[in-house]
A protein has these predicted regions:
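C-terminal helicase module of SF1/SF2 nucleic-acid helicases/translocases
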Residues: 1-26, 31-38, 43-55, 73, ...
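Post-DEXD/H (motif II) to motif III coupling segment of the RecA-like Helicase ATP-binding lobe
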Residues: 51-131
Length: 335
């Protein structure tokens, strides 16, 4: 492993071992972006690719030099630009829809921020021996939110975690929650990835209208990691006070709560935010200059030209045009 908490000596030793072939697989955080080259890498896997910008992903691949490694990008919810490129045939696309055994769909609700809603959700989870996440994404007010929850639900063991805490303190709080010595973890969105706590099966996301679809889907995925029914509450102000785009995001995440719904959520995100700039760095946004139809026509022509010239050998066994599909329906309707 290679991460920011390693000493310089240990980082250098790890990279030396990978360069000489003593290590076959190197697992790294984004610390690999700075001052590290991997010229002998033949395969690169980028997890949670929606957390990276276009330039970051390009820079990671360039670290392999002229080796041009195979690149596998993995994400629960592809960003609009990446998804659009896959749908257009620029990149190959594989979808994993089969969930782990015994998993159940997460029940998702849009709810107001009031004492009755919060206490009912928390008490239900604690009564069945579980634990609760409460997400509040403003560090300045997070202690006050934890105090308010303590007033509404007295006697509970509540911990607070956010990115501005010292690393050892945050690690201590997270370990206490994992070990079950805390009932509720009030945290910012730092919990949206990397936590697998089967006993935590209720999450309340405060001010959910301020999050993107990918963030909401990732945070909802912190619960429902066992064979118990899990619940996600999107805590928002009155819907009439929200923007149209915020309402569409909330409706999308509420409607697509079934297992394996990440791809459908990504499609809705593409519809809401637009496909972005395929020739630049913008990862979302609408085509306003030339229009979508003309842009798609130009893109199709460019792809066809590359597949018949520079990359002809690579696509020699694949047809230029997608196969036509004929569907016959047997009905009793009159002709």
């Amino acid at each position: 492993p290679l991460h920011g908490r390693l000493t310089t000596e240990l980082k250098d030793a790890t990279m030396q071992a990978f360069t000489t072939g003593e290590i076959d697989v190197l697992v790294s955080t984004t610390v690999i972006e700075v001052g590290v080259d991997v010229p002998n890498a033949t395969v690169m896997v980028i997890m949670d690719a929606d957390r990276f910008g276009v330039s970051q992903r390009g820079a990671l691949r360039e670290k392999a030099g002229e080796n041009n490694p195979h690149l596998l990008i993995m994400t629960a919810t592809p960003i609009p630009r990446t998804l659009h490129m896959s749908l257009m045939g620029v990149r190959d696309l594989s979808i994993i829809e089969t969930p782990p055994e015994d998993r159940l769909a997460i029940q998702t609700y849009i709810s107001p921020y009031d004492e009755a809603t919060v206490t009912r959700a928390i008490e239900f989870e604690l009564d069945r021996g579980g634990q609760v996440f409460f997400v509040h994404n403003r560090v300045q007010g997070i202690e006050g939110v934890a105090d308010l929850i303590g007033q509404w639900c007295p006697g509970l063991r509540i911990g607070v975690a956010h990115g501005q805490m010292p690393g050892d303190m945050m690690e201590k709080i997270l370990l206490q929650f994992i070990e079950g010595t805390l009932d509720i973890l009030v945290a910012t969105n730092i919990i949206e990835s990397g936590l697998d706590i089967p006993n935590a099966n209720t999450i309340l996301i405060n001010q959910a209208q301020n999050f993107g679809l990918s963030d909401l889907h990732q945070m909802r995925g912190r619960v429902g990691r066992s064979n118990l029914k899990a619940f996600c509450y999107l805590i928002v102000p009155p819907l009439f006070s929200l923007t149209q785009e915020a309402r569409r995001r909330l409706q999308a995440i509420e409607q697509h709560s079934e297992l394996g719904s990440g791809f459908q959520i990504a499609l809705r995100d593409l519809d809401i935010r637009g496909a972005g700039n395929m020739l630049g760095g913008e990862q979302s946004g609408f085509i306003t200059e030339i229009g979508l139809e003309l842009f798609q026509k130009i893109l199709d022509e460019a792809i066809r030209e590359l597949r018949t010239t520079e990359y002809a050998e690579l696509y020699a066994d694949q047809p230029l045009d997608p196969p036509a599909t004929e569907v016959l329906l047997d009905t009793d309707a009159p002709a």
